[in-house]
Amino acid sequence: MSRSAAASGGPRRPDQHLSPAPCGASGPPETFRTESDGAGTMNKLRQSLRRRKPAYVPEASRPHQWQADEDAVRKGTCSFPVRYLGHVEVEESRGMHVCEDAVKKLKAMGRKSVKSVLWVSADGLRVVDDKTKDLLVDQTIEKVSFCAPDRNLDKAFSYICRDGTTRRWICHCFLALKDSGERLSHAVGCAFAACLERKQRREKECGVTAAFDASRTSFAREGSFRLSGGGRPAEREAGDKKKAEAAAAPAVAPGPAQPGHVSPTPATTSPGEKGEAGTPVAAGTTAAAIPRRHAPLEQLVRQGSFRGFPALSQKNSPFKRQLSLRLNELPSTLQRRTDFQVKGTVPEMEPPGTGDSDGINALCTQISSSFASAGAPASGPPPATTGTSAWGEPSVPAAAAFQPGHKRTPSEAERWLEEVSQVAKAQQQQQQQQQQQQQQQATSVPPMPTMAPTLQPFSAPVGPFDTAAAQVAVFLPPTHMQPPFVPAYPGLGYPPMPRVPVVGITPSQMVANAFCSAAQLQPQPATLLGKAGAFPPPAAPSAPGGQARPRPNGAPWPPEPAPAPAPELDPFEAQWAALEGKPAVEKPSNPFSGDLQKTFEIEL
């Protein structure tokens, strides 16, 4: 009843309260019902006042809007604002389903897309970050194998390309912001067409043909696409005009140029004109081909180099590399090989003052020249005993071998051995003369144990004197001299032993013979002294005036411990003379072989 009174709007007592609606009452209160009806009425009113959207027309139904995109692609000014979703590897090189699966996979990854700008041109596709202006993707158009819009998302677009480094198929996906995926796909198709037209034009100009073999799924290309000029028509026409003007204009005679160099182009010309004017057009290229641009010749000419030390490049420079595992390529080895090929006498060492000398080459020169220079003392008269130096003085021929200005005969090993053989023959002749003189003196002098004045003209006595042992001690090589120097001088009192023929042996065998002869010279004085001990000791020699007999050069004779007997026919000397008189028999050249014949034998 209160409900009816309240609804009727009559007066209400203060103690009167509104009771809630029973639970079983259906529907909201009347006030709520009235508000809902008013809201619905207002929504209908608003919808009636709004403009209706035009009916959706797909992109394929309005191709007139894409004509501007084709021109922009050829000019390189076509761009679209997109969101770059990223790239993912795919298994196939083409197919719309492959692109759609790649878009789904990238969206499922939850990666944040990058707001960027897609530039489409006949050269390639470039994606530039809109905020940082970084180049995200730079794709050559020839590497793109497939592009398509997404059938599930109107603004999705993706393309498949071959990765240049890993050789895998990669799918790049985009979401267009203002345009649809179909428009982006159409622009990329225009880029394909422009690239194909450019390639066909190059094939026609360069004469390139490609033969495709279906059985081998390969093609063979003949010719080259490498043009040396720009690919745009404007550049080609400009190049044709320049060539026509250059052919029509008379050629100006250039000034005198340096030999081996083309006259440089003036610096006022542009780099393009330099390359076109300075480089001749090849006969095989067509008239439309522009020659490749090169650097000007004045930049390619060597300006100079620092050559402050010309002595370092000489043959005997001490700064050359001497240590190498390849011994045949060492500078010192090459120098020794080439020195034998030079005709005439070449000084091995430069005169003092230049300062350029090679220690290794000098040492080798001294060793080799010691054998070659041995013929100089043999040509003169045999040195007499009276001309020998004092006991403490060094020998003159030994010092002459170390002169820095000596010269070596630059010949082959055969010529070197021939000179050594001549020296040996000269020594043999000298020894024969000495033996003849000894025989004459032995027959004319009576066998008295006293020393007679007739012993002075002896050139090289072979008898068992103590002075002979002293002479050997004088000519023994010092510590600083190499042993090969000992047999090179004919002034020795004893011939070099063993006398092995030197013709036809190698230089190493010659050095070995020299060492053997130097080693066998030393035990002879002791042997001869032992032989001399068999004679009775004679009285001390005295001069007629009772004074010591002076030497012809003014120096006094050294004190002799025991007088030596007069030279007489000793069995050892007779055997030695018999061996010297025999002709030289050909013996094996190797001193280390076991079949050497016995020349002499010493009994102790």
Curated annotation (Swiss-Prot):
One of its GO terms (cellular component) is glutamatergic synapse. Residues 74-225 form the PID domain. It is found in: Cytoplasm. Residues 233-245, 409-418 have a biased composition (Basic and acidic residues). Residues 553-568 have a biased composition (Pro residues). Residues 1-68, 223-283, 372-457, 531-604 are annotated as: Disordered. The modification Phosphoserine is found at S224, S228, S263, S411. Its main location: cytoplasm. The keyword Transmembrane helix does not apply. It holds the Pfam family NumbF. Interacts (via PTB domain) with MAP3K7IP2 (via C-terminal). Interacts (via C-terminal) with TRAF6 (via TRAF domains). Associates with EPS15 and NOTCH1. The PTB domain is necessary for the inhibition of MAP3K7IP2-mediated activation of NF-kappa-B. This is Numb-like protein. It comes from Mus musculus (Mouse).
